[in-house]
């Protein structure tokens, strides 16, 4: 088992080598717009997963993920050779290319947040003109329980302003 720090360094180096090779050395039209975003190497340094995204031909154009995946599969051997020469490790890791869905997740979250903001704005507009149903104060003041009296009972103030003391004797059985 290799050190996790060594695996991270190797993954970073693989990311750099593969991105540079795709941009400057491999002339495949299917790799136009492919960007290497990350790489992960297993603890034994034998397998590397390289994550990529694909840009569309225009800002509004849909990227061709199938063509990019096919082009990366065609270039896998050349890229592994370049990784082996560039890293200097005893065993060159096998490369697996996986589409990075982080940007898709970000776009989806942005859409959900925009919908939530719009729903909040609609609710705020409705709330401005809303009036309570029924009376202005639907809760009647039937009396409130205040502090205990000196006799040990509770003083109850009614809405008429009268005070009554509840000593708790109502619930005791008489002898």
From Swiss-Prot:
Please give the organism: Mycobacterium ulcerans (strain Agy99)
Q: Which PANTHER family match?
A: RIBOSOME-BINDING FACTOR A, CHLOROPLASTIC-RELATED (PTHR33515:SF1)
Primary localisation category? cytoplasm
Q: Which SUPFAM superfamilies match?
A: Ribosome-binding factor A, RbfA
What are the start and end residues of every segment in region (Disordered)? 131-175
Function per UniProt = One of several proteins that assist in the late maturation steps of the functional core of the 30S ribosomal subunit. Associates with free 30S ribosomal subunits (but not with 30S subunits that are part of 70S ribosomes or polysomes). Required for efficient processing of 16S rRNA. May interact with the 5'-terminal helix region of 16S rRNA.
| Family stated for the protein in its record | Belongs to the RbfA family.
Q: Does the keyword Cytoplasm apply?
A: yes
* Pfam families for this protein: RBFA (PF02033)
Per the record, where are the segments of Acidic residues compositional bias?
162-175
Q: How does it assemble?
A: Monomer. Binds 30S ribosomal subunits, but not 50S ribosomal subunits or 70S ribosomes.
Q: Which GO terms describe its molecular function?
A: ribosomal small subunit binding
Can you name this protein? Ribosome-binding factor A
Listed InterPro entries: KH_dom-like_a/b, RbfA, RbfA_dom_sf, Ribosome-bd_factorA_CS
GO BP term, pick one: maturation of SSU-rRNA
An example Gene Ontology CC term for this record: cytosol
Which controlled-vocabulary keywords does the entry list? Cytoplasm, Ribosome biogenesis
Q: Does the keyword Glycoprotein apply?
A: no
As for subcellular location, the record says: Cytoplasm
